[in-house]
């Protein structure tokens, strides 16, 4: 079979375009696309929507007396030897990117300031998955201390938010132009106010076990419903990510009263105890993560106090 013959004029035109200034401009536009105005917003919305909707498809009905329409994520163990590291709440979200020429500083490395735009995208992807089951919190009975000093548990009006409160980033190695990398973010732990997320910039070109760490970052998020702060533990419990705290630990009765928590949920919404992670397992993992967070959280508070003093 004869090969198709391309018109000589067309080949000349393509060749002329590729090696013209227009070709150079097109190439620069492609490799700098992530730095164009509006592209960050498109990336953020894409990852938020895909992560949020993807998690919603992995939920099952688990109604309570307070919330008849409650849905929770399916979080069963895959086997008797499955470890808490595999719990979906603690699984990382990963985005892949590259260093565009527009991100280079005068040292010809990725500018420090540009790390934060990538961090935003990675954390948004993670947060979109975590918030999906309970959002927008309209049916949640939030526990909080009222202005009269009394503890309340009721539905709260207002706009929900899972907002970034602070972040700290440590730079390990430089990244040169066009270098490819992944940004991995996962939940480390939480306290009475903040949800802590760890993020890492890594190169995986060496294969598994040979990753190269470029930077690490620690961030904290707060859950809000209107002006009211929602405790991370309550948010995660009513979202079905973690089971209610056992009575023996001395937590509030209201959380103990929740009957269904989503752990070990099957397609029909039923639960099997042998397929679940216990509250003690999750709490142990949270405390392990908080040992990483503790020093930074204290330093952040001292830094704020140093300015005020």
Swiss-Prot record:
Q: Which InterPro entries match?
A: HotDog_dom_sf, THEM6_lcsJ_thioesterase
GO molecular function (one): transferase activity
Q: Which domain of life is it from?
A: Eukaryota
Region (Disordered): which ranges?
A: 61-83, 239-275
Q: Which residues are glycosylated?
A: 112
Spell out the subcellular localization from the entry: Membrane
* GO-annotated cellular components: membrane
Membrane-spanning residues:
11-31
Does the keyword Glycoprotein belong to this entry? yes
Q: What is this protein called?
A: Thioesterase lcsJ
- The organism encoding this protein is Purpureocillium lilacinum (Paecilomyces lilacinus)
Q: What is the lineage of its organism?
A: Eukaryota, Fungi, Dikarya, Ascomycota, Pezizomycotina
